[in-house]
Design a protein with these regions (language model features):
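Immediate post-signal peptide segment of exported/extracytoplasmic ligand-binding proteins
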Residues: 31-46, 167-207, 242, 285
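Ligand-binding cleft/hinge of the Venus flytrap
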Residues: 55-73, 104, 154, 201-204, ...
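C-terminal motif of bacterial Sec signal peptides marking the signal peptidase cleavage site
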Residues: 21-24
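Extracytoplasmic small-molecule ligand-binding "clamshell" domains
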Residues: 39, 70-74, 82, 151, ...
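Acidic, polar ligand-binding/catalytic clefts
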Residues: 29-41, 106-117, 127, 217, ...
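Ligand-binding clefts/hinges and TM-proximal coupling segments of bilobed small-molecule sensing domains
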Residues: 54-71, 111, 141-181, 291, ...
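Transmembrane alpha-helices and adjacent helix-loop boundaries
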Residues: 288-517
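Periplasmic-binding protein-like
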Residues: 96, 100-140, 161-172, 195, ...
Length: 517
């Protein structure tokens, strides 16, 4: 057993070295892309955009013309930049300020001088929060008149300051419970954002900073309320506002007719222009490429960025542990109900309910279930996101665990139940003391596979704004624009967790088989 564990550790070590080597090597361009010099050259080009942004909408209009223009949509701007650097797309359309931030880290990228389009940013609020919208508008007008917003923007763009506004302390703000209730607030004004959009919102030293964060804090000071910033996927911001998970969204959001049908918007607080980014392929401009050690230092050691992975690892372990407990308990109950009905009849209604549950949970994607539970089931409840993830993954895994355990129960000879009952044991005691131990021993390897699947499925927790291992790597990638290194390390961490879980299952299986000797 010790030798086998040693082999697992060696395998993990060499896998991590391989991933780090691949990250250091990078990747060469697979093909020559179209050369763009002006906006007119976009015809027939492959355009990269961040999903759900203004750039997405504008580029989609070009795609609809049917002249060969194609739009590639990415969840994060950093992913689009990586695709541009690898010549997977011809260009990227984004806002000017983030484009300058991208270029600062990747000198081989160029920003075309011609403006692609002009737009302005606003804060989104639920349509039924008219008082809150009016209050935010009043705050924006005051901040504009006093020059506060212009000062925030200039200090960020011209001087590169991460925090350009210091909010007042909570004891200075005098808004009472009645005023909070009138605005539709509980304790604070919660803003949803997507912290991958430097300089408007991004991570620095473990905190979300940027223009939008400073503007939100300034608005809170004028309104006299505390402000809370929550990070989530960009395409989940409007949904979170609609569901009441947050009161407002501020993430470089542009007002469009389609969005106005579903959500309300405040007055604009910043004017921006859309630009086109291209990869010049200038090796001299890019300079000497950093080696593996430099990349590792940039991704994990600078500003203590490894903390994002540690936080994600902790959340992943907590979610997995409690989801396993929930799935095994619920799956066992369902398996007993189904096995009882198949062997002895009766329990028709409970069996029908169990079958309905299994059909729904196995017939719909895990991510859809997670989003429904968070945005619909717990829409009006202010619950911990880890709790929501445990419930979602536990319920999903229970559907598969139930069928595995049921097959184990059915594999036990029916005479075992009759023997237990003849000894004076009740049905429940016979099932618990005689049938289930044999069933678990028979299906333990299959159960182990399902639990490993559960562990890997927790990687979608970031869609509800929860920092898991994958989300931690996303944060690092959004800061460093380095793709392979964070993803390679996260892949190795998942591999180590899976090997550990697999070793635990094998050890338990070996212990249970001692009874056969």
């Amino acid at each position: 057993m010790k030798y086998r564990n040693l082999r697992c550790l060696r395998l993990s070590f060499w896998a991590m070295l391989l991933c780090l080597f691949l990250a250091a090597c990078g990747s060469e361009s697979s093909e020559t892309r179209k050369q763009l010099k002006t906006k007119a050259d976009l015809k027939g080009a492959v355009i990269g955009v961040q999903l759900g942004t203004t750039s997405d909408g504008l580029a989609t209009e070009l795609e609809k013309k049917g002249d060969g223009t194609k739009v590639e949509r990415y969840n994060k701007g950093a992913d689009a930049i990586q695709a541009l650097l690898q010549d997977k797309i011809d260009c990227m359309v984004t806002d000017e300020a983030p484009a300058k931030a991208f270029k600062r880290v990747n000198p081989s990228l160029n920003i075309l001088p011609e403006t692609f389009d002009a737009s302005s940013f606003a804060i989104c609020v639920a349509k039924d929060h008219a008082e809150l919208k009016q209050s935010i508008n009043n705050a924006i007008r005051i901040l504009k008149a006093n020059g506060v917003i212009d000062s925030i923007v200039n200090r960020h763009l011209e001087r590169g300051i991460a925090v350009a506004y210091t909010p007042k302390t909570s004891d200075v703000k005098k808004v009472g419970p009645e005023a909070l209730k009138h605005l539709g607030l509980k304790k604070s004004l919660r803003f949803a954002t997507n912290a991958t959009f430097e300089p408007f919102e991004y991570y620095q030293n473990g905190k979300i900073v940027g223009i939008d964060v400073d503007v939100a804090n300034a608005i809170g000071d004028v309104m006299g309320v505390d402000v809370e910033i929550l990070d989530m996927e960009f395409d989940a911001i409007i949904t979170s506002v609609q569901a009441g998970k947050v009161e407002a969204g501020i993430a470089g959001i542009t007002v469009t007719p389609e969005r106005e049908k579903n959500i309300g918007f405040t007055d604009s607080y910043a004017d921006v222009r859309q630009v086109i980014m291209v990869n010049s392929g200038d090796v001299k401009a890019a300079g000497n490429q950093p080696g593996m050690i430099d990349k590792f230092k940039s991704c994990f050691m600078d500003d203590n960025r490894y903390q994002y992975l540690l936080q994600g690892l902790g959340n992943t372990l907590i979610i997995t542990l409690f989801a396993i407990i929930l799935s095994v308990i619920l799956g066992t109950v369902i398996a007993i109900v189904r096995a009882r009905h198949e062997r002895r009849g009766g329990w028709r209604i409970p069996n029908m309910l169990c079958q309905l549950y299994l059909t729904i949970m196995r017939g719909t994607p895990t991510m859809v279930q997670l989003l429904i539970i968070y945005y619909v089931v717990f829409a009006s409840a202010d619950v911990n996101k880890i709790f929501v993830a445990v419930i979602a993954f536990g319920l999903n895994s229970a559907a598969y665990i139930a069928e595995v355990i049921r097959s184990g129960i059915m594999s036990v000879d029916e005479g075992q139940m009759e023997a237990g009952r003849s000894l004076g044991l009740s049905y429940g005691k016979t099932m618990r003391l005689i049938i289930l131990p044999q069933a678990f021993k028979n299906v333990l390897p299959a159960m182990g596979n399902e639990l490993i699947t559960l562990l890997k499925e927790t990687s979608i927790s970031g869609y509800i704004g929860l920092v898991d291992l994958t989300k931690g790597s996303d944060i690092i990638r959004s800061i460093t624009y380095e793709a392979m290194m964070p993803l390679g390390v996260v892949a190795c961490l998942y591999l180590i967790l899976v090997l550990g879980l697999n070793a635990g299952v094998r050890k338990l299986e070996k212990r249970l088989r001692k009874s056969e000797r």
